[in-house]
A protein has these predicted regions:
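Conserved phosphate-binding catalytic cores of ATP/NTP-utilizing and phosphoryl-transfer enzymes
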Residues: 1, 167-199, 398-413
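Gly/Thr-rich phosphate-binding beta-strand-loop-beta motif of the actin/hexokinase/Hsp70
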Residues: 2-26, 184-224, 508-525
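Acidic, glycine/GT-rich loop-and beta-edge segments that sit at the periphery of enzyme/chaperone cores
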Residues: 11, 261-262, 383-499
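Phosphate-binding loop and its immediate beta->loop->alpha context
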Residues: 26-156, 161, 241-298, 549-559
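Gly/charged contiguous loops adjacent to phosphate- or pyrophosphate-bearing nucleotide/cofactor binding elements
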Residues: 68-69, 73-76, 86, 234-372
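Adenine-nucleotide phosphate-binding core of ATP-dependent small-molecule kinases
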Residues: 95-121, 311-347, 452-453, 462-465, ...
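Glycine-rich phosphate-binding loops at beta-strand->alpha-helix junctions
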Residues: 133-150, 331, 351-376, 392-397
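Conserved phosphate-binding/catalytic loops in two-lobed NTP-binding clefts
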Residues: 161-175, 373-403
């Protein structure tokens, strides 16, 4: 079996998983598939590794739990949530978070992923290179124009590691759904078909996605129909997810100190307090459920029973159950309710029947989160939408890495749908007169296969160098707002493709392809005008930074 792994590169935690055992019969049918979430080292109990990097005053770096334990040392800088910093271009924001021209988000990410991959290879005695690393990324990275470059940057970062042969990105909800599909078949002995709603609530993000699962021969195929979300992947900061909830609990508990919220968070002892509260939330899930089960919702904030005690400046401070409810109602409940409402509106508007509702991510294990989700969908006794899903709730936080591992081994396939409209357009440098879309949003993509511009009769459209059309890029369902290369970006694109004047009997064929990570490649062929199937020269250019290429032009055209 190849050295393939799935990586959940999370905002707050990261998990590596692999297929420990894979048995097939003589026809190739999978008869046994055993997944394993990999521990980062001997003696470590959890596969979940803190997505933290600490730069010490001597410029050396510490990672994960070591970084957490060393937080607050004089002259040190703690980097967290760095995955989402890939989309940040504001120098002031980057500087405020400790980034410099030397220690960029890209470098911190590379150092962190290099560390966890090497630990995995050492712990599990992996000889040779990693054949394929499939990484779960937020679904919004496939949808929101300002985060599109995050995919190419992350893929390039991991691909640059000399021991990684191939990198593929997949949306986190699709990966979680892949794990559910595999788990369903394992427990029920038949394949699942239908609509699955994935609610992924982690430490930094909320991602809600409606997935469609279909049979494809012996295997299953997953596609994402609709999504919405909140948190670091939406607003650009951790404000609507598990980390913010824990921070709010600590601030409430330490309010008797007289310190402000910012003073508490910036105190070097804060992260140890937060870590102890987080551990208590995981260890006392049954106590939380038993306490809140018998109290009306509107009375929960007034519960003074102690949940846990934290130590700050050598003094104990009580965390009450009422504080848990108050923090939840302030930080989590409003936005979770809003986003669940948005998804329900979509489901009802399109008359969609949801067959399964699955909660993944560590924060979905919290009782109040579970209760709010169930209330939103009016869960009743014996509700089949919530049953036969992921029976062991401890596996929820590993679902994305498990699904990525299954996709890495091609046990579950992912139906690739174009997240945007792509094509060519006619016009001048200052005006796009008409757009010709050759790939439409929602089209099923044959990955890495170029689609060329066609005439209405189905024949190939041929171009001469002086009449090369603009490249059109569009995220709008209505196609009313096109974004096209023009001026300097157009010149750069023509230069990259090496478009030049041709002989009188030659013409260009132009096309576009998308890879499995939905990264765009432009293609050219030089053909004989009298025999378009006769190709004299081919070339292509991968648009690694499409947002940077389009840049201000997008904003200008949409104003």
């Amino acid at each position: 079996m190849a050295n393939n792994i799935g990586l959940d590169f999370g905002t707050t935690y990261s998990v590596i998983s692999r297929i420990k055992q894979l048995d097939r019969d003589e026809t190739g049918k999978v008869i046994k598939c055993e997944l394993e979430a990999c521990l980062p080292g001997e003696g470590v109990l959890s596969p979940c590794q803190d997505s933290l990097v600490l730069k010490k005053n001597d410029n050396s770096l510490e990672f994960g739990s070591l970084a957490r334990e060393s937080t607050g040392r004089k002259g040190s800088i703690l980097y967290k949530g760095f995955k989402m910093m890939l989309a940040e271009t504001d120098e002031k924001v980057l500087k405020a978070r400790g980034y410099t021209h030397e220690y960029t988000p890209e470098r911190i990410i590379k150092e962190f992923i290099d560390d966890i991959l090497k630990k995995y290879m050492e712990t599990y005695q992996i000889d040779g290179n990693l054949d394929k690393v499939v990484i779960g990324v937020p679904e919004i990275w496939f949808k929101k124009v300002s985060t599109i470059d995050c995919r190419t940057k992350l893929e390039n970062i991991v691909s640059s590691l000399p021991y990684v042969n191939k990198v593929e990105l997949v949306s986190e909800p699709a990966a979680a759904c892949a794990y559910f599909v595999n788990n369903f078949k394992k427990e029920n002995h038949y394949s699942f078909k239908g609509k699955v709603l994935i609610i992924d609530y982690g430490g930094g993000t909320l991602d809600i996605a409606l997935c469609d699962v279909r049979e494809k021969g012996e295997f299953s195929e997953v596609s994402v129909m609709e999504r919405c979300g909140a948190g670091l992947n939406e607003e650009g900061y951790i404000g609507k997810a598990g980390v913010a909830f824990i921070e709010e609990i600590v601030k409430l508990a330490l309010s008797p100190t007289g310190l402000s919220g910012n003073e508490i968070i910036n105190n070097r002892k804060f992260y140890k307090c937060a870590a102890s509260v987080e551990n208590a939330l995981m260890l006392k899930m049954k106590d939380i459920k038993n306490t809140f089960d018998f109290v009306e919702i509107f009375n929960r904030e007034s519960i003074n029973d102690e949940f846990y005690s934290i130590e700050f400046d050598d003094e104990p401070y009580s965390v009450t159950y009422g504080m848990l409810a108050k923090a939840y109602n302030k930080v989590i409940s409003p936005v979770l309710g809003q986003k669940l409402g948005e998804m329900l509106d979509y489901i009802n508007t399109h008359n969609i029947t949801v067959d399964k509702i699955i909660s993944v991510g560590g924060f979905c294990n919290f009782y109040l989160t579970q209760a709010q989700i169930e209330d939103a969908f009016a869960r009743g006794a014996g509700d089949s939408r919530f049953s036969d899903a992921i029976s062991d709730k401890r596996e929820c936080e590993k679902a994305i890495s498990y699904g990525a591992a299954l996709i890495a081994e091609d046990i579950i396939s992912f139906k690739h749908l174009s997240p945007y409209y792509l094509g060519f357009g006619k016009g001048s440098d200052k005006e796009l007169k008409k757009a010709y879309y050759i790939i439409k949003k929602g089209d099923v993509i044959d990955c890495d296969k170029p689609v060329f511009v066609k005439n209405p009769d189905g024949t190939d459209t041929l171009f001469i160098a002086k009449k090369i059309p603009l490249f059109v890029f569009n995220l709008d369902d209505s196609c009313e707002k096109e974004s096209a290369l023009w001026g300097e970006p157009l010149g750069e694109y023509q230069k990259m493709l090496e478009l030049r004047p041709l002989e009188s009997w030659q013409r260009y064929k132009l096309g576009i392809s998308l890879d499995k990570s939905m990264i765009i490649t432009l293609h050219k062929q030089i053909v004989d005008v009298n025999n378009p199937n006769e190709v004299y020269e081919e070339g292509h250019v991968r648009l690694d930074e499409i947002y940077a290429i389009l840049g201000n032009m997008i904003e200008e055209r949409r104003n």
